Design a protein with these regions (language model features):
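Phosphate/NTP-binding elements of NTP-utilizing enzymes
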Residues: 1-133
Length: 133
């Protein structure tokens, strides 16, 4: 049992064994980190191991999968640690919807024995926060 708990707390193991993504051609596949994602993951883990708060600004990164790996890390932290809440803010309602659907797919594809309990079902409209310009 201790080995299983240790593996579930290992973010890379958890992400690559339990989380799934939807590809551009709409296939559902296990999330396997690409080299750029792996570099970002390594930087984040180094900062965490050093006890530093992780603050990363990524400028103009498109189609590298950075949002996916960040979302996967947030999901892992949220479902494997007690009293952890995460928040992602997107620049548009379309981006918010995309991130919400990614998170929902992570949850839906988890083995039932690993799914955290939910107080209530969330809908996309629950997650969109209006903002003033």
């Amino acid at each position: 049992m201790k080995e299983l708990v240790a593996k579930l707390r290992d973010a890379k193991f958890y992400i690559e064994h339990f989380l799934h993504i939807r590809t551009k051609d709409q296939k559902i596949v296990k999330l396997t980190m690409k080299p750029a994602q792996q570099r970002l993951y390594d930087i984040i883990q180094r900062e965490r191991a050093a006890g530093k708060p992780v603050r990363i600004v990524i400028l103009k990164a498109r189609q590298l999968g950075f949002s996916t790996v960040i979302e996967a890390l947030f999901f892992h932290d949220t479902v494997t640690r007690q009293l952890v809440e995460t928040l992602i803010i997107a620049h548009s309602s379309d981006a918010t919807t995309k991130l919400f659907r990614m998170n929902k797919l992570f949850f839906d594809m988890l083995p039932k024995s690993l799914r955290p309990m939910r107080k209530r079902k969330r809908r996309i409209r629950d997650c969109a926060v209006p903002y003033a310009v």
